[in-house]
């Protein structure tokens, strides 16, 4: 049979092993590099563009997919297709091109006990209100990384100004982000790479984290703290900060690449694989295995028969229109290089190298 060549950044050794075996059981032969060979979305997309041998591209985020769909990469174009489950992924689609697999978002959490707000409920209009909350907050310890970038995007959302020469964000926005970094609790310690541990230890009252690992982390919270967070699905001493704007989600998608010399019959096999991988059953199994949340609502129903977890009911402002017809995710994509320059040049994380 035909070997289906896959490029992805969702390619930990566990994921690639699972995918090769599950695909084999479903009658497909696939080839995919794990993250010892290709690490990150930039590397995955560059390899696919340079090697020109890919059949399937999956993972990435809206930033990258809008580029692929719009023909940014010389050798990457997508086959026109519509899977039978297209309706089940709703708004997570580039119709006829790419369809949603997995969503995750960033969360703002706080302690409600005496190490936190002592029972006071936190309710913000914007993410950026954290700088005026009156409590100690965590801030991440580097510019790079998907989660860190998403947190910055969430904090900058309320300061969109298409007329601003500073990356389309008002000067107040950059001042607020500076304040967030300068006055947030920081450590170069490895446990401070993300915001769960500082909150779990009680070093801060308010923190940020990514959705896909939250429930698992709370389940195991007592292993790494004397003052652990308690109550996974029914919080006892913690909660989500209620934020009117919502939060910033990223979604992973799957698309079928055009490939020179591939026969019609082989293309049909590739389509059949994409159909299988994005289906409710497969995505529910993938979500179960890797603690991820499916775009496919039928898969979510299989995974969560008791209803959608609270962290995935939050409004998604990445898909809100901010400048004419442009979504905030597209706006972030258009300005991301400028934002990285601003963050770096202004030394937002200035103390880190010497900390």
PLM features per residue range, with description:
Residues 1-66:
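Early extracytoplasmic/lumenal segment of secretory-pathway proteins
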Residues 52-57, 74-112, 138-139, 244-246:
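A structural signal for short loop-to-beta-strand junctions that line the ligand-binding cleft
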Residues 68-79, 90-96, 217-242, 308:
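Ligand-binding "clamshell"
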Residues 83, 87, 104, 175-181, ...:
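Periplasmic-binding protein-like
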Residues 127-147, 155-159:
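Short loop->beta-strand "edge-of-pocket" segments that line small-molecule binding or catalytic clefts
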Residues 154, 161-239:
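Ligand-binding pocket segment of bilobal, Venus flytrap-like solute-binding proteins
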Residues 252-326:
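Mature extracytoplasmic/periplasmic domains
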Residues 315-355:
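Conserved C-terminal helix/tail region of periplasmic/extracytoplasmic solute-binding proteins
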């Amino acid at each position: 049979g035909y070997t289906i060549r896959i490029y992805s950044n969702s390619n930990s050794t566990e994921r690639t092993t699972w995918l090769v075996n599950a695909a084999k059981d479903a009658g497909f032969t696939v080839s995919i590099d794990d993250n010892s060979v290709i690490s990150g979305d930039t590397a995955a997309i560059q390899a696919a563009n340079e090697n020109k041998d890919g059949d399937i591209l999956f993972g990435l985020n809206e930033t990258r997919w809008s580029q692929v769909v719009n023909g940014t990469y010389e050798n990457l174009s997508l086959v026109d297709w519509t899977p039978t489950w297209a309706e089940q992924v709703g708004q997570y689609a580039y119709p006829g091109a790419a369809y949603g697999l997995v969503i995750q978002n960033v969360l703002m959490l706080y302690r409600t006990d005496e190490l936190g707000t002592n029972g006071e409920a936190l309710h913000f209009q914007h993410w950026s209100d954290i700088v005026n909350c009156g409590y100690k907050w965590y801030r991440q310890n580097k510019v790079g990384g998907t989660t860190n970038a998403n947190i910055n995007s969430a904090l900058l959302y309320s300061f969109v100004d298409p007329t601003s020469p500073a990356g389309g964000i008002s000067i107040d926005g950059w001042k607020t982000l500076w304040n967030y970094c300068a006055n947030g609790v920081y450590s170069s310690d490895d446990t401070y790479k993300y915001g769960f541990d500082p909150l779990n230890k009680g070093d801060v009252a308010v923190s940020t984290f990514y959705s896909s690992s939250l429930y698992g982390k709370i389940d195991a919270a007592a292993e790494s703290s004397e003052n652990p967070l308690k109550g996974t699905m029914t919080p006892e001493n913690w909660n989500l900060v209620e934020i009117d704007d919502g939060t910033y989600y990223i979604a992973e998608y799957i698309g079928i690449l055009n490939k020179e010399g591939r026969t019609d019959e082989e293309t049909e096999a590739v389509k059949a694989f994409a159909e299988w991988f994005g289906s409710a059953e497969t995505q529910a199994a993938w979500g179960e295995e890797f603690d991820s949340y499916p775009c496919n609502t039928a898969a979510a129903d299989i995974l969560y028969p008791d209803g959608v977890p609270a962290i995935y009911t939050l409004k998604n402002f990445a898909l809100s229109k901010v400048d004419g017809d442009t979504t905030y995710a597209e706006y972030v994509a258009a300005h991301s290089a400028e934002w990285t320059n601003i963050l770096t040049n202004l030394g937002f994380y200035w103390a880190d190298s010497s900390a």
